[in-house]
């Protein structure tokens, strides 16, 4: 285990730091497993497994693999889908975007070198037998004794001798549902026995990387693990092979707890936030992209998987329908320049009711449809009703929330509020999408009922937008009651609210010592108000409904605040 200490320490840090994106997936994985067991032709599976053991594979072999992958993908609910992610200044700072672009480029070069060729998207060993023999002859002529191609320990190189190497991309990698189905059907085991065996392996994985010795010991207690291969994992090995790494990935899904990275789900609405958190953990722990060809370290592996799709289950879902590589599907736009800060209007002024761009208006409508009009719904704002700078709507039963910002009209009042209340900085709101708060309020369901700590400001905000049909219930907590769970909420969910960077000072009574305080974040306030009313902090993880890129104006947006 000593060799794995630095690497596993990174894994543990990533598990802790990204816990808000991990999910209990055991039920979902087993649901897909049962679908595969009932409908998959395991004779075809056996033929694919036989094919990948061949030393040389051809176009017809690749066609069989891709057809098999399509059948598996059609039977599974857990999958990643094709999505192009373009990150701009706003959700991430320019320095963070530059860091991400650099890491993706380093990763591209490393993967390319590892796969053995100069062109991206081509896997190691994509040489014909004739080319391999010519290479060996060249090495011998240069004095290298016993020259033979690098490969397995027996010296055998397994190659894909095909016309279009890009067809290999994303056709490999194990899927827990498929691994469990193969262990059950081909191992002649009961599904429950396989689940119990993998659960034991998963518990071990919470404290270390399981190795072959561990596998042998666990096999004595769980015979279902006997089917796991003792051969080392290699590149371009299909997800139908029952390797130790495939078993460990499946085992991670059997542990509903432990914040396993394998259980991360990526959604477009939280992609930028996830990347931001990943970069923060990387810098805090001193993680890096290694230049040495070979297996990816935990940071490299997670970065690649997240950036490959940005929509789905990066570790455990079917990804055969995804085209391209991580650096193809996630790009950084550093050319977008921050919009000029608009001059403030004296003495505030009413919010501008101009419409936002059509595509963002559609996104707002889709996001609001994710809310349940009949469920308990908290709302809070920072700023004044006629000049709000932040708004949050939160439904504790599902964890769904809508959270956005707005650049203020009254700069002087804003700075005063920042100093004594919310801690937001003017420069961080310069690119906030104008008209977003108005658009959200305009599209809220008719007669929806909201819960708030202090209803006057919310009612005035609704009335200014002509929404007298919306109702607000005031819980009327005291200042101390409202913030009973403040420290716990900030400790658990601080990564959801990254704009409140300013120093907040408690308003002191005459003669009292001046002290600092936590800033008031509209989103975290709604969560802590709910905790006070219910008496506990809910386990339900907050889930963003409004994509983070919608919060910031495009470079072409010319709508004034």
From Swiss-Prot:
Region Disordered, annotated ranges: 336-355
The protein's enzyme class: hydrolase
Compartments in which it is found: Virion; Host cytoplasm
Transmembrane segments: none
UniProt-annotated stretches for the region Binding site for the cap structure m7GTP: 52-237
Gene Ontology molecular function: hydrolase activity; metal ion binding; RNA binding
Record site feature (Important for exonuclease activity), residues: 457
Gene3D superfamilies, per the entry: Arenaviral nucleoprotein, C-terminal domain, Arenavirus nucleocapsid protein, head domain
E.C. number(s) listed in UniProt: 3.1.13.-
GO process annotations (BP): negative stranded viral RNA replication; RNA-templated viral transcription; symbiont-mediated suppression of host cytoplasmic pattern recognition receptor signaling pathway via inhibition of IKBKE activity
Residues where Zn(2+) binds: 390, 497, 500, 521
Binding site for Mn(2+): 380, 382, 525
Organism of derivation: Pichinde mammarenavirus
Pfam families in UniProt: Arena_ncap_C, Arena_nucleocap
UniProt protein name: Nucleoprotein
Gene name linked to the record: N
Family named by the database record: Belongs to the arenaviridae nucleocapsid protein family.
